From Swiss-Prot:
Homodimer. One of its GO terms (cellular component) is cytoplasm. It holds the Pfam family Abhydrolase_1. Transfers an acetyl group from acetyl-CoA to L-homoserine, forming acetyl-L-homoserine. Residues 45-352 form the AB hydrolase-1 domain. Keywords: Acyltransferase, Amino-acid biosynthesis, CBS domain, Cytoplasm, Methionine biosynthesis, Repeat, Transferase. Substrate binds at residues 219, 347. This is Homoserine O-acetyltransferase. Coiled coil: none annotated. Its EC number is 2.3.1.31. Pathway: Amino-acid biosynthesis; L-methionine biosynthesis via de novo pathway; O-acetyl-L-homoserine from L-homoserine: step 1/1. Signal peptide: none annotated. GO terms for molecular function: homoserine O-acetyltransferase activity.
Length: 487
């Protein structure tokens, strides 16, 4: 049940305690990482949220005076998938970003001026190492999970390779195990738009005179890839914007043109052009394959995985997520796959909160037997007659009846089929027909375990017992969809 937001939050800034050794060979000192924290840490409950390409550390809650919550507020907070009553959630702005973490717009301590293009080229691996150092500095020695969508999913997968024993669960959404030629092509066009703007000036521009035109064009082009044909048909169609007929010129006329223009204009107010260059190049370099094999590249991973795709995503189509799944299962890793059904394209991972809350919530905090069992079910003493058992089952409209001993512990189970067979066998005593070697389960056990026990033993009910073998409840196949749980 979804509840409230995490409320008012503030972004914190941390200077890493050691220099970062980057993949390009540079050692970067004085790195600062912006982050937000929601919920209390207990040493084993920390979840790291990795943001997409142009995201930031403000993933949930509200900054003072704001009316718009963080970018993933729909799944972070009390009662949501990333339940802040249960987990401590940390979101950090990536290395190379422009929302508080060290990047090309930060001051170079050697010159007192912004780095610009003298900032070293970074990779997804470098981002993950910066996040790892942040967590170590904060006294966090392990992660319950890392979750991210798009470029955030790349970081999550990189975490599983770089620090396999540090993280227990990986949730990769609408992403891939490597960057495809199409992704590289889109990044190249975006960078060309920025670098061809005269105001870019080789990356040396004042804050008040950025290459906004080029950045706006880059955003417009990229935003097309976040949508889908269906979503654009539904949202815009061929509608004109504020006019009834064609103007026969080159001004903005169609609604979709106006929308993209708005996306570009608002984006330049919150993002740095050089950061866009650096981060898209980091995405270009992302490749978890080893010797051309994703299976080999993921061989050292240890975490449990949840891989999620979006049905209408053509930027990161489902087949890219399925490639990750194939590599993981080939390596005998515990992995689940889910597909969000959405018309929204790549943006579906930011919009389909109901599906995400269910899918992610079940992976992080699976339902247990206690959630579905019938509490305090009827039971019968083992000294009772078959007739008494039959009357009790008919009266309560049940097909499974626990049989208990004098001290209340479980000694057997009788079914409606046992009752029917007793007539043909002319049995009188319950002990003659009941099953004595009963397969049981405990209330804290997972539904997946319950389903597998039912399937393995070809049974349709499980008595739920405590440590003393007293019956607490019953779980039946009528309340547990075997096929859904196993899937």
């Amino acid at each position: 049940m979804l509840q409230d937001s995490v409320g008012e939050v503030t972004t914190k800034y941390h200077a890493l305690s050691v220099p970062l050794s980057l993949e390009c060979g540079v050692s970067l000192s004085g790195v600062r990482i912006a982050y937000e924290r929601y919920g209390r840490a207990d040493g084993k409950n920390v979840i790291l949220v990795c943001h997409p390409l142009t995201g930031d550390a403000h993933a949930a809650g509200f900054h003072k005076g704001d009316t718009k919550p963080g970018w993933w507020d729909g799944i972070i907070g009390p009662g949501k998938a990333l339940d802040t009553n249960r987990y401590c959630v940390i979101a950090a702005n990536v290395l190379g970003g422009c929302k508080g973490s060290t990047g090309p717009s930060s001051e170079d301590p050697a010159t007192g001026k912004p780095y610009g293009t003298t900032f070293p080229v970074i990779t997804i691996r470098d981002m993950v190492h910066a996040e790892h150092q942040l967590l170590e500095d904060l006294g966090i020695s392990e992660l319950y999970a890392v979750i991210g969508g798009s470029m955030g999913g790349m970081q999550a997968m990189q975490w599983s390779v770089e620090f396999p024993s540090f993280v227990r669960r990986i949730i990769c959404i609408a992403s891939a195990g490597y960057t495809t030629p199409m992704h590289i092509a889109f990044g190249a066009v975006g960078r060309a738009a920025i670098m061809s703007d005269p105001e870019w000036n080789g990356g040396n521009y004042p804050a008040e005179k950025k290459p906004n035109h080029g950045l706006s064009l880059a955003r417009m082009m990229a935003h097309i890839t976040y949508l889908s044909d269906e979503s654009m048909r539904t949202k815009f169609g061929r509608r004109l914007q504020k006019q009834d007929a064609f103007g026969y010129g080159f001004d903005t006329e169609f609604s979709v043109e106006s929308y993209l223009q708005h996306q570009g204009e608002t984006f330049v107010e919150r993002f740095d052009p050089n950061s866009y260059l650096y981060i898209t190049r980091a995405v270009d370099y992302y490749d978890l394959t080893k010797n051309g094999s994703l299976t080999e590249g993921l061989a050292a991973t240890q975490a449990k995985f949840l891989i999620i795709s979006v049905s209408s995503d053509w930027l990161y189509p489902p087949y890219l997520s399925q490639e990750i799944m194939l590599a993981l299962t080939t390596n005998n890793r515990e992995a689940r796959y889910a597909e969000i059904v959405s018309p929204h394209g790549h943006d579906g991972f930011l919009l389909e909160n109901a599906q995400l809350n269910y899918i992610v919530g079940q992976f992080l905090t699976p339902m247990t037997v206690e959630d579905l069992m019938t509490n305090n079910p009827p039971s019968i003493q083992e000294t009772s007659s078959i007739r008494e058992a039959a009357e009790l089952m008919i009266g309560h409209e049940i097909n499974h009846l626990p049989v208990v001993s004098g001290n209340g512990t479980l000694s057997g189970i009788v079914t409606s089929w046992d009752i029917a067979k007793s007539v043909a066998g002319d049995f009188q005593d319950l002990a003659e027909i009941m099953t004595k070697d009963v397969i049981t389960i405990q209330r804290s056990d997972s539904l997946r375990l319950a389903a597998s026990l039912m399937e393995k033993h070809a049974i349709s009910a499980l008595p739920v017992v405590d440590d003393s073998n007293h019956v607490l409840g019953m779980l039946t196949s009528e309340t547990l969809s075997l096929s859904e749980v196993l899937q």
